[in-house]
Amino acid sequence: MLLFFTLGLLIHFVFFASIFDIYFTSPLVHGMTPQFTPLPPPARRLVLFVADGLRADALYELDENGNSRAPFIRNIIMHEGSWGISHTRVPTESRPGHVALIAGFYEDVSAVAKGWKENPVEFDSLFNESKYTWSWGSPDILPMFAKGASGDHVYTYSYDAKREDFGAQDATKLDTWVFDNVKDFFHHARNNQSLFSKINEEKIVFFLHLLGIDTNGHAHRPSSRDYKHNIKKVDDGVKEIVSMFNHFYGNDGKTTFIFTSDHGMTDWGSHGAGHPSETLTPLVTWGAGIKYPQRVSAQQFDDAFLKEWRLENWKRLDVNQADIAPLMTSLIGVPFPLNSVGILPVDYLNNTDLFKAESMFTNAVQILEQFKVKMTQKKEVTLPFLFTPFKLLSDSKQFNILRKARSYIKHRKFDEVVSLCKELIHLALKGLSYYHTYDRFFLGVNVVIGFVGWISYASLLIIKSHSNLIKGVSKEVKKPSHLLPCSFVAIGILVAFFLLIQACPWTYYVYGLLPLPIWYAVLREFQVIQDLVVSVLTYPLSHFVGYLLAFTLGIEVLVLSFFYRYMLTAGLTAFAAWPFLTRLWTRAKMTSLSWTFFSLLLAVFPLMPVVGRKPDISLVMGAGLLVLLLSLCVVTSLMKRKDSFIKEELLVHLLQVLSTVLSMYVVYSTQSSLLRKQGLPLMNQIISWATLASSLVVPLLSSPVLFQRLFSILLSLMSTYLLLSTGYEALFPLVLSCLMFVWINIEQETLQQSGVCCKQKLTSIQFSYNTDITQFRQLYLDDIRRAFFLVFFLVTAFFGTGNIASINSFDLASVYCFLTVFSPFMMGALMMWKILIPFVLVMCAFEAVQLTTQLSSKSLFLIVLVISDIMALHFFFLVKDYGSWLDIGTSISHYVIVMSMTIFLVFLNGLAQLLTTKKLRLCGKPKSHFM
């Protein structure tokens, strides 16, 4: 069975990885010829301000007194330049946002997982094409463009990473550092002839990355005074820098200024997903080559922002974030970034119609070059009779459009040129997408075949080894035939040869060949399949259809709960009514009432706000007090039992109570310290990490008696969970655990009611007994319900207090007891552990259910695996790459979550077994347990 689980784990890793090969592969191509506009540019230099984490509404709206938070930028909009909204794409993170701005290229979603400093951009950018680029700002952003550039013409000046502290006194210092260093740089340049000559060259870029707004947004939220004050500080800094540039270059009118943001931020201070507050960023441009403000009487937009911002009379020009890169390159006359997919927003340009037409033509040729390279690459690795070209953009059509565009330019029909080039760009982008997804159907079919095969094999294994379903059916053993293995070997050779002649990547061999051994294992059990069919036919059709419908309904409720959290409430409400629909109510009234009460109490959580809630430390304190009260009741009741406690066990419980008290103190004092802007106290940080480290060790010191061990696990994990909580979610594990304790009791009642085995006294059961294989029984129909309950509780543990399908559901304030200095992977790991704590509590309860119902962990675990895999297959079909970016990201993340859950089940099952069965001792004395 160990071999089966090892192979199962490997297969699930392949299925998990498949989504990245099918949907997350980078569309990058190399080998294009650089393209640039053959006319003199309007600007010699460009200054790019990126206010990290700045929302469009936060910049453009007026405050409660009717004044702008950024009066200088507002004045630019009304009197000097052009403005609009830059629409970003998912993931709304700093690296992808800057790549889109500076390279005109949308990285795939997996870019979020890349280390920023150690992973320079692998493609061309504005900085790379410039003669020189000087950049100031965050050490997380600047190095990736400098290291990715060819040559050494990109210079970076960044502060120490420790400055990025969410608990710092004043995050605006990150921005004032940038402004001060830029001023010092230009002051120094006057006395340095070499530097002076460089900054007086043409085709140069100055990049100012301003992180203060993002840091204040994470720490205090965008509605805070700190966030809004930071916008004013940035506005003042931009005003000073613009004045300095104009003075330094003698007001030569050859400087272009671009002010924008990489992404926005949600009301609760996070970003990463596709909410409008994250995807709508400001864009303000002025200076050389930029149109002056255009007064209009009416504008057509689907939103009501213009009226809210009182900018309805100034023409708003919206762009996609990647469009800013070709705008900047055309302004200073450098080649368009080779991998750019941005479309030049000609409405921003203040130049001749000829310049606009030539720039648009260059833009079209540059994107068409990518299409040609992509098509050639795909054609070279596909058999001629299997290759299907992109019909909308044939070679002849490309030639005709380009020829017609040149003819229009010659005859000075510039509007027609712009329109024709936009049409060509849209076709080329469609073609790029077509060839990028060319193999998607082949890969998808193989993954689905493998999935169905695996589910079939796991189901057959359950029926064959762990049930009585085919007992009594004919056991005639047939001599194995060599035809089946030979057939599969032949098919495998054909598939491998087909992939080899097409020069496919090695991963294609994995996806293409994996279904073969799986289906071979299924068809080897043909006798079991026959016996199963015979056995099923003996059951009444109505019973079979009823069970099938109930199972399907249960799966659909689980799937729908990923989209609508209130489905969890509906499911838990149905669970609450379950005892009254059976004989449980008559046999165990108190247990049934407890089950109903805690089911309904837990059902409240999915109805509460997912995110956007303000921190409420009083609820965290309340949860801590409830834990202490419960602990006092349990310890008191156990101490009353004769010989139930020895000193060591009492010491462990007191240690856990002390840990809970310390956690409450740390949460309160950390919150107070951060509000006073005094940062995270070192002692609090030490206590937090010590609590986290001890939470998986202290339970091993407690008694292995079932309820004592489970309660010890709850106390230890709750101490850590309190440190990671900011509001009502601190109550969630407590309510969930209470329901788990009742679940263990009620399952014993159902087992006795069904007459499968006699009821054991729970106070006499020790977790160490679960290694006794002689006590295990065969599976019955009711065990499918138990497995379904587990999956439902696991999904509830995931979605009970938030929608983790979305990156922006994470609140960074959750980790402030552990660290406040920006560290994406450490913070991510802590938040992942916060998600897994309820998961661990459910798995430990499941261990107890298996033990009390005398079931093999393997048999019940197999049913859980089948249910999870059916859900995963469901979500695989729901994955899409069309519609809004929020829909695309959500559909992919749902599949990733279910697959992760299935893989984590194996590891968490092992962790739960370790926590429940392992016993450590403080001293060498022999242990005694109460009966």
From Swiss-Prot:
Membrane side Cytoplasmic: residue ranges = 1, 464-482, 530-543, 587-591, 640-649, 707-723, 808-824, 880-894
Q: What is this protein called?
A: GPI ethanolamine phosphate transferase 1
The linked condition is:
Multiple congenital anomalies-hypotonia-seizures syndrome 1: An autosomal recessive disorder characterized by neonatal hypotonia, lack of psychomotor development, seizures, dysmorphic features, and variable congenital anomalies involving the cardiac, urinary, and gastrointestinal systems. Most affected individuals die before 3 years of age.
Keyword Glycoprotein listed? The answer is yes
Quick one: which pathway? Glycolipid biosynthesis; glycosylphosphatidylinositol-anchor biosynthesis
The record describes the protein's role as:
Ethanolamine phosphate transferase that catalyzes an ethanolamine phosphate (EtNP) transfer from phosphatidylethanolamine (PE) to the 2-OH position of the first alpha-1,4-linked mannose of the alpha-D-Man-(1->6)-alpha-D-Man-(1->4)-alpha-D-GlcN-(1->6)-(1-radyl,2-acyl-sn-glycero-3-phospho)-2-acyl-inositol (also termed H3) intermediate to generate an alpha-D-Man-(1->6)-2-PEtn-alpha-D-Man-(1->4)-alpha-D-GlcN-(1->6)-(1-radyl,2-acyl-sn-glycero-3-phospho)-2-acyl-inositol and participates in the eighth step of the glycosylphosphatidylinositol-anchor biosynthesis.
Naturally occurring in which organism (per UniProt): Homo sapiens (Human)
Where are the glycosylation sites? N128, N192, N350
List locations, semicolon-separated.
Endoplasmic reticulum membrane
Q: What class of enzyme is it?
A: transferase
GO molecular function list: mannose-ethanolamine phosphotransferase activity
